[in-house]
Regions:
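Hydrophobic, well-ordered secondary-structure elements that form the walls
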Residues: 241, 252, 287
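Membrane-cytosol interface segments of multi-pass membrane proteins
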Residues: 1-149, 265-297
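Alpha-helical transmembrane segments and terminal signal-anchor/GPI-anchor hydrophobic tails
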Residues: 152-153, 157-158, 169-175, 184-239, ...
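Short, amphipathic, aromatic/basic-enriched membrane-interface segments that mark the entry/exit
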Residues: 4-12, 107-113, 163-167, 185-192, ...
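Juxtamembrane helix-loop boundaries in multi-pass membrane proteins
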Residues: 72, 243-250
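Discrete transmembrane alpha-helix packing/kink hotspots characteristic
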Residues: 252-255, 279
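Specific transmembrane alpha-helix
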Residues: 40-54, 115-130, 155-189, 215-233, ...
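Short, flexible helix-coil linker/hinge segments at the edges of structured domains or between repeats
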Residues: 93-99, 153-162
Length: 297
């Protein structure tokens, strides 16, 4: 294992911006939704990259099981919370049928919760990837392997019509693995192989999906990461922004409903995006001061 890369506060800003991008995309729903795809891709890259940094700081050890267990309670409670919200705001006759779709057991009633069970499983790859890729030659082979892996995953996402959250996971896993490899590549001082892998993965996505709106996600997320990574930023408030990002992601669907309740469904999309984002941020700040609630963020 190479010497770890020191944490840079520009990454905290990147996490915060990615959270806003997700909120923004939900306020401006379109078939293209390039902001949402880029933001989720960046979230995946950053989550994996920071996990690899954590392993490097621990001398090559990563407590996957313990970390996954810490996410179980937040996952279950958030799923229950959004299920209750769905029962309150929905007027459909089938809203009380809990197992109409068994896959909802993984995500509750809100699809954005696909991220929590995905991360619980994906963390299992951190230590094996970190230990196996220990030379420039293995780095290059791993990057080539990511491009090859993306072919069946992206094809299955586009062609098989699988139930949610499987389509999200099929895109997310290759991108998450790319983020892990980026953590190693940066420590080696060799970012070009991962940039080439991202370009290859986007090309694969374009070919196998016929130019689906998300095909650019791997390359765009890596380019944004690389640009922000190089910004010489240092400020006391930046770590707090990064720490709030995931909580904002979790809270924003509820806050979006609050905005629509207060201002009506015809509210300007930009206003609803900014208002829901700021309300979610404020909610996270307050929640993190309450010990029992802080672990849910």
């Amino acid at each position: 294992m190479k010497k770890q890369v020191q944490h840079r506060q520009s990454i905290d800003l990147a996490r915060f911006c990615a959270a806003f991008g997700v909120v923004f995309s939900h306020a401006f729903p379109t078939t293209e939704d390039w902001v949402g795809h880029l933001s989720v891709g960046l979230f995946l890259i950053l989550t994996a990259f920071l996990a690899m940094q954590s392993m490097q700081r621990a001398g090559g050890r990563y407590g996957f099981v313990a970390r996954a267990q810490k996410l179980v309670v937040p996952w279950l409670l958030w799923s229950a919370f959004f299920r209750v919200v769905d029962l309150v705001v929905s007027d459909t006759a089938d809203r009380f049928i809990l197992l109409e779709n068994p896959w909802t057991l993984l995500i509750g009633s809100s699809i954005h919760l696909w991220f929590l069970p995905f991360i619980m499983g994906a963390m299992a790859f951190v230590q094996p990837v970190g230990r196996q890729i220990n030379s420039p030659a293995r780095l290059i082979r791993a990057c080539a392997g990511l491009v090859a892996l993306s072919v069946p995953f992206f094809w299955a996402h586009d062609r098989l019509g699988l139930p949610e959250p499987l389509p999200q996971w099929l895109i997310a896993l290759p991108v998450y693995l790319l983020g892990l490899v980026m953590g190693i590549a940066q420590a080696m001082g060799r970012p070009l192989p991962t940039l080439a892998a991202a370009a290859g993965m986007s090309l694969v996505a374009y070919i196998v999906t016929g130019g689906a709106p998300w095909f650019f996600t791997p390359l765009a997320a890596v380019l944004v990461f690389e640009a922000l990574w190089r910004l010489p930023m240092q400020a006391r408030f930046l770590p707090a922004l990064g720490q709030a990002a995931f909580g904002i992601y979790l809270l924003h669907p509820f806050m979006m409903l609050v905005v629509y309740k207060l201002f009506g469904s015809g509210v300007a999309p930009m206003f609803s995006a900014v208002a829901a984002f700021l309300m979610s941020w404020a909610g996270v700040v307050v929640a993190r001061k309450i010990p029992l609630v802080a672990r849910l963020m």
